[in-house]
Amino acid sequence: MTLDEYILQHIDAEGDYLHALWRDTQLRLSYGQMASGHLQGRLLKMLVQMIKPLKVLELGTFSGYATLSMAEGLPEGAEIHTFEVFDENEDFLREWFEGS
């Protein structure tokens, strides 16, 4: 059994919304391989759940996969702020953030 297989057997399943976002990222954005995926997303969610921050600052949103993964782990009333320098991703990000 590979390390990836072991990890995938012991972490939360990827939700339908995040899976759809990852797929849409691959289809619509240049450099889709830069997107965080299931393993990275679950790690970020777990870290946020352990630390329980009231505010998170993310620099580099890209497709928003990591952003939404961290948001899943935030406590009630917490905030996440994210910045992306590539303005061509803005419409894509708004679509997915507003739908979340």
What annotation goes with each model-predicted range?
Residues 1-100:
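A short alpha-helical cap/connector motif
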